[in-house]
Amino acid sequence: MSSEAETQQPPAAPAAALSAADTKPGSTGSGAGSGGPGGLTSAAPAGGDKKVIATKVLGTVKWFNVRNGYGFINRNDTKEDVFVHQTAIKKNNPRKYLRSVGDGETVEFDVVEGEKGAEAANVTGPGGVPVQGSKYAADRNHYRRYPRRRGPPRNYQQNYQNSESGEKNEGSESAPEGQAQQRRPYRRRRFPPYYMRRPYARRPQYSNPPVQGEVMEGADNQGAGEQGRPVRQNMYRGYRPRFRRGPPRQRQPREDGNEEDKENQGDETQGQQPPQRRYRRNFNYRRRRPENPKPQDGKETKAADPPAENSSAPEAEQGGAE
Protein backbone atom coordinates (compact mmCIF):
# COMPACT_ATOMS: atom_id res chain seq x y z
CA MET A 1 0.00 0.00 0.00
CA SER A 2 2.89 2.33 0.64
CA SER A 3 4.03 2.02 -2.98
CA GLU A 4 0.54 2.88 -4.23
CA ALA A 5 0.47 5.94 -1.97
CA GLU A 6 3.77 7.09 -3.37
CA THR A 7 2.51 6.76 -6.92
CA GLN A 8 -0.61 8.75 -6.14
CA GLN A 9 1.21 11.65 -4.50
CA PRO A 10 2.82 13.20 -7.64
CA PRO A 11 -0.50 13.90 -9.42
CA ALA A 12 -1.75 15.59 -6.26
CA ALA A 13 1.12 18.12 -6.38
CA PRO A 14 0.09 19.81 -9.69
CA ALA A 15 -3.49 20.05 -8.47
CA ALA A 16 -2.28 21.90 -5.39
CA ALA A 17 -0.17 24.16 -7.60
CA LEU A 18 -3.20 25.01 -9.71
CA SER A 19 -5.27 25.84 -6.68
CA ALA A 20 -2.48 28.01 -5.28
CA ALA A 21 -2.14 29.77 -8.61
CA ASP A 22 -5.82 30.58 -8.72
CA THR A 23 -5.69 32.11 -5.25
CA LYS A 24 -3.19 34.73 -6.52
CA PRO A 25 -4.91 36.63 -9.30
CA GLY A 26 -2.22 39.31 -9.34
CA SER A 27 0.52 36.84 -10.26
CA THR A 28 1.19 35.57 -13.74
CA GLY A 29 0.41 32.06 -12.55
CA SER A 30 -3.26 32.98 -12.32
CA GLY A 31 -3.41 32.57 -16.07
CA ALA A 32 -2.77 28.85 -15.73
CA GLY A 33 -6.46 28.23 -15.18
CA SER A 34 -7.55 30.34 -18.11
CA GLY A 35 -4.58 29.34 -20.23
CA GLY A 36 -1.01 30.61 -20.70
CA PRO A 37 0.52 31.36 -24.11
CA GLY A 38 -0.47 27.82 -24.91
CA GLY A 39 -3.24 28.04 -22.34
CA LEU A 40 -5.57 29.51 -24.93
CA THR A 41 -5.81 26.08 -26.45
CA SER A 42 -5.63 24.40 -23.03
CA ALA A 43 -8.89 26.11 -22.00
CA ALA A 44 -10.84 23.33 -23.70
CA PRO A 45 -9.10 20.45 -21.92
CA ALA A 46 -9.34 22.45 -18.74
CA GLY A 47 -13.09 22.47 -19.27
CA GLY A 48 -13.20 19.37 -17.12
CA ASP A 49 -12.02 21.51 -14.20
CA LYS A 50 -13.74 24.76 -15.24
CA LYS A 51 -17.23 24.82 -16.57
CA VAL A 52 -18.12 27.14 -19.45
CA ILE A 53 -20.97 29.31 -18.23
CA ALA A 54 -21.59 31.38 -21.37
CA THR A 55 -20.00 31.98 -24.75
CA LYS A 56 -19.66 35.09 -26.89
CA VAL A 57 -20.79 37.46 -24.19
CA LEU A 58 -20.41 41.19 -24.73
CA GLY A 59 -19.09 43.33 -21.94
CA THR A 60 -17.40 46.61 -21.14
CA VAL A 61 -13.95 46.73 -19.60
CA LYS A 62 -14.22 48.21 -16.14
CA TRP A 63 -10.50 48.58 -15.59
CA PHE A 64 -7.35 46.80 -16.63
CA ASN A 65 -3.86 47.14 -15.16
CA VAL A 66 -1.25 46.71 -17.88
CA ARG A 67 1.64 46.32 -15.45
CA ASN A 68 0.03 43.56 -13.41
CA GLY A 69 -1.74 42.09 -16.41
CA TYR A 70 -5.26 41.69 -15.10
CA GLY A 71 -8.54 43.57 -14.69
CA PHE A 72 -12.31 43.22 -14.69
CA ILE A 73 -14.99 43.24 -17.38
CA ASN A 74 -18.59 44.21 -16.67
CA ARG A 75 -21.05 41.98 -18.52
CA ASN A 76 -23.71 43.85 -20.47
CA ASP A 77 -26.43 41.25 -19.85
CA THR A 78 -26.13 40.55 -16.13
CA LYS A 79 -24.01 43.57 -15.10
CA GLU A 80 -21.67 41.19 -13.33
CA ASP A 81 -17.93 41.80 -13.03
CA VAL A 82 -15.80 39.08 -14.60
CA PHE A 83 -12.11 38.67 -13.87
CA VAL A 84 -9.86 38.82 -16.94
CA HIS A 85 -6.15 38.06 -17.21
CA GLN A 86 -3.83 39.12 -20.01
CA THR A 87 -3.30 35.48 -21.02
CA ALA A 88 -7.05 35.18 -21.69
CA ILE A 89 -6.86 37.73 -24.52
CA LYS A 90 -7.06 35.68 -27.69
CA LYS A 91 -6.67 38.37 -30.35
CA ASN A 92 -4.48 41.24 -29.28
CA ASN A 93 -3.93 44.47 -31.15
CA PRO A 94 -1.04 43.73 -33.56
CA ARG A 95 0.38 47.19 -32.93
CA LYS A 96 0.65 46.64 -29.20
CA TYR A 97 3.67 45.03 -27.63
CA LEU A 98 1.78 43.55 -24.65
CA ARG A 99 -1.60 41.92 -24.37
CA SER A 100 -4.04 44.36 -22.85
CA VAL A 101 -7.59 45.66 -22.93
CA GLY A 102 -8.50 49.34 -22.90
CA ASP A 103 -10.65 50.89 -20.20
CA GLY A 104 -14.25 51.29 -21.40
CA GLU A 105 -13.66 49.07 -24.42
CA THR A 106 -16.40 46.71 -25.58
CA VAL A 107 -15.14 43.14 -25.88
CA GLU A 108 -16.53 39.71 -26.60
CA PHE A 109 -15.51 36.78 -24.41
CA ASP A 110 -16.45 33.43 -22.94
CA VAL A 111 -17.34 33.17 -19.26
CA VAL A 112 -15.66 30.31 -17.42
CA GLU A 113 -16.24 29.30 -13.82
CA GLY A 114 -13.14 29.77 -11.70
CA GLU A 115 -12.43 28.93 -8.09
CA LYS A 116 -13.03 32.49 -6.90
CA GLY A 117 -15.76 33.35 -9.38
CA ALA A 118 -16.40 33.92 -13.06
CA GLU A 119 -13.41 34.42 -15.32
CA ALA A 120 -13.15 35.56 -18.92
CA ALA A 121 -11.57 33.44 -21.63
CA ASN A 122 -11.00 33.86 -25.37
CA VAL A 123 -11.32 37.63 -25.15
CA THR A 124 -11.65 39.35 -28.53
CA GLY A 125 -13.27 42.41 -29.95
CA PRO A 126 -16.92 42.40 -31.02
CA GLY A 127 -17.32 40.00 -33.93
CA GLY A 128 -13.97 38.30 -33.30
CA VAL A 129 -11.81 41.26 -34.31
CA PRO A 130 -8.61 42.07 -32.37
CA VAL A 131 -9.04 44.17 -29.26
CA GLN A 132 -7.92 47.80 -29.29
CA GLY A 133 -5.73 47.49 -26.22
CA SER A 134 -4.91 49.90 -23.44
CA LYS A 135 -3.46 53.30 -24.19
CA TYR A 136 -0.83 52.64 -21.53
CA ALA A 137 0.49 49.55 -23.31
CA ALA A 138 3.72 49.86 -25.27
CA ASP A 139 3.33 50.42 -28.98
CA ARG A 140 5.45 48.44 -31.42
CA ASN A 141 5.47 51.22 -34.01
CA HIS A 142 7.45 53.30 -31.56
CA TYR A 143 10.57 51.40 -32.65
CA ARG A 144 9.81 51.76 -36.34
CA ARG A 145 9.64 55.52 -36.29
CA TYR A 146 13.36 56.07 -36.06
CA PRO A 147 14.30 55.10 -39.63
CA ARG A 148 11.36 57.12 -40.90
CA ARG A 149 12.53 60.17 -39.00
CA ARG A 150 16.05 59.74 -40.29
CA GLY A 151 14.85 59.66 -43.88
CA PRO A 152 14.27 63.38 -44.52
CA PRO A 153 17.59 64.53 -43.02
CA ARG A 154 19.47 62.08 -45.22
CA ASN A 155 17.76 63.44 -48.31
CA TYR A 156 18.63 66.93 -47.14
CA GLN A 157 22.26 65.88 -46.81
CA GLN A 158 22.25 64.47 -50.31
CA ASN A 159 20.79 67.68 -51.75
CA TYR A 160 23.30 69.75 -49.82
CA GLN A 161 26.13 67.54 -51.04
CA ASN A 162 24.85 67.79 -54.61
CA SER A 163 25.09 71.58 -54.47
CA GLU A 164 28.58 71.43 -53.01
CA SER A 165 29.83 68.80 -55.42
CA GLY A 166 28.32 70.76 -58.32
CA GLU A 167 30.34 73.81 -57.34
CA LYS A 168 33.55 71.89 -56.76
CA ASN A 169 33.30 69.57 -59.76
CA GLU A 170 31.80 71.00 -62.93
CA GLY A 171 31.37 67.57 -64.52
CA SER A 172 28.11 65.77 -63.90
CA GLU A 173 29.82 62.38 -63.58
CA SER A 174 32.03 63.37 -60.68
CA ALA A 175 29.04 64.47 -58.53
CA PRO A 176 27.60 61.00 -57.79
CA GLU A 177 31.07 59.70 -56.95
CA GLY A 178 31.47 62.48 -54.39
CA GLN A 179 28.08 61.58 -52.94
CA ALA A 180 28.98 57.91 -52.52
CA GLN A 181 32.15 58.86 -50.70
CA GLN A 182 30.48 61.42 -48.48
CA ARG A 183 27.45 59.35 -47.47
CA ARG A 184 29.36 56.74 -45.48
CA PRO A 185 31.08 58.99 -42.92
CA TYR A 186 27.84 60.88 -42.23
CA ARG A 187 25.99 57.64 -41.47
CA ARG A 188 28.68 56.55 -39.03
CA ARG A 189 29.17 59.89 -37.33
CA ARG A 190 25.50 60.87 -37.49
CA PHE A 191 24.16 64.39 -37.23
CA PRO A 192 26.07 66.42 -34.60
CA PRO A 193 29.44 66.41 -36.42
CA TYR A 194 27.63 67.17 -39.68
CA TYR A 195 26.10 70.34 -38.29
CA MET A 196 29.37 71.32 -36.67
CA ARG A 197 31.12 71.16 -40.02
CA ARG A 198 28.72 73.46 -41.80
CA PRO A 199 30.24 76.85 -40.97
CA TYR A 200 33.77 75.67 -41.77
CA ALA A 201 32.74 74.11 -45.04
CA ARG A 202 30.65 77.00 -46.30
CA ARG A 203 33.10 79.85 -45.93
CA PRO A 204 35.87 78.72 -48.28
CA GLN A 205 33.51 77.15 -50.81
CA TYR A 206 31.25 80.14 -51.38
CA SER A 207 33.82 82.89 -50.85
CA ASN A 208 36.84 81.56 -52.76
CA PRO A 209 35.48 80.42 -56.15
CA PRO A 210 34.49 83.92 -57.39
CA VAL A 211 37.94 85.20 -56.43
CA GLN A 212 39.61 82.50 -58.46
CA GLY A 213 37.36 83.18 -61.45
CA GLU A 214 38.32 86.86 -61.44
CA VAL A 215 41.99 86.11 -61.18
CA MET A 216 42.00 83.73 -64.12
CA GLU A 217 40.64 86.42 -66.42
CA GLY A 218 43.55 88.80 -65.96
CA ALA A 219 46.43 86.66 -64.61
CA ASP A 220 48.65 83.91 -66.01
CA ASN A 221 48.63 80.26 -64.98
CA GLN A 222 51.60 80.84 -62.68
CA GLY A 223 49.73 83.49 -60.77
CA ALA A 224 46.75 81.14 -60.43
CA GLY A 225 49.00 78.43 -58.99
CA GLU A 226 50.34 80.85 -56.40
CA GLN A 227 46.84 82.00 -55.50
CA GLY A 228 45.73 78.48 -54.51
CA ARG A 229 48.22 78.39 -51.64
CA PRO A 230 47.01 81.40 -49.62
CA VAL A 231 43.43 80.15 -50.00
CA ARG A 232 44.32 77.00 -48.06
CA GLN A 233 46.17 79.00 -45.45
CA ASN A 234 43.17 81.25 -44.94
CA MET A 235 41.04 78.24 -43.99
CA TYR A 236 43.20 77.44 -40.97
CA ARG A 237 44.57 80.83 -39.94
CA GLY A 238 42.95 84.14 -39.18
CA TYR A 239 43.05 85.94 -42.51
CA ARG A 240 41.33 89.21 -41.67
CA PRO A 241 44.47 90.97 -40.40
CA ARG A 242 46.22 89.93 -43.61
CA PHE A 243 43.53 91.59 -45.68
CA ARG A 244 43.88 94.80 -43.72
CA ARG A 245 47.64 94.87 -44.15
CA GLY A 246 47.47 94.16 -47.85
CA PRO A 247 45.74 97.23 -49.36
CA PRO A 248 48.13 99.98 -48.11
CA ARG A 249 51.07 98.06 -49.60
CA GLN A 250 49.32 97.82 -52.93
CA ARG A 251 48.42 101.49 -53.06
CA GLN A 252 51.97 102.87 -52.87
CA PRO A 253 53.29 101.71 -56.26
CA ARG A 254 50.01 102.68 -57.90
CA GLU A 255 50.22 106.23 -56.62
CA ASP A 256 53.80 106.53 -57.91
CA GLY A 257 52.74 105.20 -61.26
CA ASN A 258 49.84 107.64 -61.31
CA GLU A 259 52.18 110.59 -60.73
CA GLU A 260 54.38 109.49 -63.62
CA ASP A 261 51.35 109.14 -65.86
CA LYS A 262 50.15 112.62 -64.98
CA GLU A 263 53.50 114.12 -65.97
CA ASN A 264 53.68 112.32 -69.31
CA GLN A 265 50.05 112.56 -70.40
CA GLY A 266 48.10 115.43 -71.89
CA ASP A 267 44.91 117.06 -70.67
CA GLU A 268 42.70 114.74 -72.71
CA THR A 269 44.21 111.54 -71.34
CA GLN A 270 44.04 112.90 -67.79
CA GLY A 271 40.30 113.51 -68.13
CA GLN A 272 39.65 109.97 -69.31
CA GLN A 273 41.80 107.87 -66.96
CA PRO A 274 40.91 109.03 -63.41
CA PRO A 275 37.51 107.29 -63.41
CA GLN A 276 39.20 104.14 -64.69
CA ARG A 277 41.79 104.28 -61.92
CA ARG A 278 39.14 104.79 -59.27
CA TYR A 279 37.19 101.83 -60.57
CA ARG A 280 40.30 99.67 -60.51
CA ARG A 281 41.18 100.74 -56.98
CA ASN A 282 37.75 99.90 -55.64
CA PHE A 283 37.65 96.61 -57.50
CA ASN A 284 41.03 95.47 -56.20
CA TYR A 285 40.38 96.72 -52.69
CA ARG A 286 37.10 94.87 -52.28
CA ARG A 287 37.45 91.56 -54.04
CA ARG A 288 41.15 90.87 -54.41
CA ARG A 289 42.19 91.05 -50.80
CA PRO A 290 43.28 87.40 -50.33
CA GLU A 291 45.48 87.44 -53.44
CA ASN A 292 49.28 87.82 -53.45
CA PRO A 293 50.67 91.09 -54.70
CA LYS A 294 52.72 89.31 -57.39
CA PRO A 295 49.96 88.79 -59.94
CA GLN A 296 48.64 92.25 -59.15
CA ASP A 297 52.05 93.78 -59.86
CA GLY A 298 51.90 92.16 -63.24
CA LYS A 299 48.52 93.76 -63.77
CA GLU A 300 49.82 97.10 -62.63
CA THR A 301 52.66 96.97 -65.12
CA LYS A 302 50.20 95.99 -67.83
CA ALA A 303 47.91 98.79 -66.79
CA ALA A 304 50.82 101.22 -66.73
CA ASP A 305 52.05 100.25 -70.20
CA PRO A 306 49.05 101.42 -72.22
CA PRO A 307 49.12 104.94 -70.77
CA ALA A 308 52.79 105.13 -71.72
CA GLU A 309 51.83 104.23 -75.26
CA ASN A 310 49.04 106.75 -75.17
CA SER A 311 51.41 109.39 -73.89
CA SER A 312 53.82 108.70 -76.75
CA ALA A 313 50.99 108.96 -79.23
CA PRO A 314 50.10 112.59 -78.43
CA GLU A 315 53.79 113.51 -78.51
CA ALA A 316 54.01 112.12 -82.01
CA GLU A 317 50.90 114.05 -82.97
CA GLN A 318 52.35 117.23 -81.55
CA GLY A 319 55.57 116.68 -83.49
CA GLY A 320 53.62 116.16 -86.68
CA ALA A 321 51.64 119.30 -86.03
CA GLU A 322 54.82 121.30 -85.55
UniProtKB/Swiss-Prot annotation:
Keywords: Acetylation, Activator, Cytoplasm, DNA-binding, Isopeptide bond, Mitogen, mRNA processing, mRNA splicing, Nucleus, Phosphoprotein, Repressor, RNA-binding, Secreted, Transcription, Transcription regulation, Ubl conjugation. It comes from Rattus norvegicus. It is found in: Cytoplasm; Nucleus; Cytoplasmic granule; Secreted. The record marks 63 as: Important for C5-methylcytosine-recognition. CDD domains: CSP_CDS. Residues 59-123 form the CSD domain. In the CSD domain, Trp-63 specifically recognizes C5-methylcytosine (m5C) modification through its indole ring. Pfam families: CSD. The modification N-acetylserine is found at residue 2. The modification Phosphoserine is found at residues 100, 163, 165, 172, 174, 312. One of its GO terms (biological process) is tRNA transport. This is Y-box-binding protein 1. Residues 290-303 have a biased composition (Basic and acidic residues). Residues 1-47, 118-322 are annotated as: Disordered. Residues 14-69 are annotated as: Interaction with ss-DNA. GO terms for molecular function: C5-methylcytidine-containing RNA reader activity; chromatin binding; GTPase binding; miRNA binding; mRNA binding; nucleic acid binding; p53 binding; RNA binding. DNA- and RNA-binding protein involved in various processes, such as translational repression, RNA stabilization, mRNA splicing, DNA repair and transcription regulation. Predominantly acts as a RNA-binding protein: binds preferentially to the 5'-[CU]CUGCG-3' RNA motif and specifically recognizes mRNA transcripts modified by C5-methylcytosine (m5C). Promotes mRNA stabilization: acts by binding to m5C-containing mRNAs and recruiting the mRNA stability maintainer ELAVL1, thereby preventing mRNA decay. Component of the CRD-mediated complex that promotes MYC mRNA stability.
